[in-house]
């Protein structure tokens, strides 16, 4: 299975790639193809230097966002909340009809101490709802998930993920 990660060069993208490459072909996406290719090469080196090297059957490679969206069986949107409209607008017409779109997007902001959650406000739409609305011509399965997974733990393949996470199916025309 080809798992594409738009925003794949960020921390969450790295974590998903490192953990899922054991059994899948992972395609990191970036607006800058070279950045995605460099990140994928670094991730493969990290895997090969880990205790899991002999268990990895998949690969990680990089490409531009549009190519990743076009060839993925599952597409993870690992992007900031404020980029949902622009990113989905670019990819809406090229995603395969059988592709499953996954949104781990959580509204976050950053200050000198790091990232912090922006509380849900009345009238503000959830990330999953915005993804669905911004893929209007798509009859895709859209899943909102992985919101409670720590980026730091996800990137550390030696760490056990011991958190519960909820999944919400947001879909049209099934």
Residue ranges of each PLM-predicted region?
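Short beta->alpha connector loops
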Residues: 80-84, 148-150, 172-173
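N-terminal glycine-rich dinucleotide-binding loop that anchors FAD/FMN and/or NAD(P) in oxidoreductases
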Residues: 45-57
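Conserved catalytic-site region of short-chain dehydrogenase/reductase
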Residues: 110, 149-153
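Rossmann-like NAD(P)-binding element
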Residues: 54-102, 107-113
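NAD(P)+-binding Rossmann beta1-loop-alpha1 motif at the extreme N-terminus of oxidoreductases
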Residues: 1-46
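Short beta-strand and adjoining strand-loop segment in the mid-core
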Residues: 115-124, 129, 157-174
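Rossmann-fold dehydrogenase core element
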Residues: 121-147
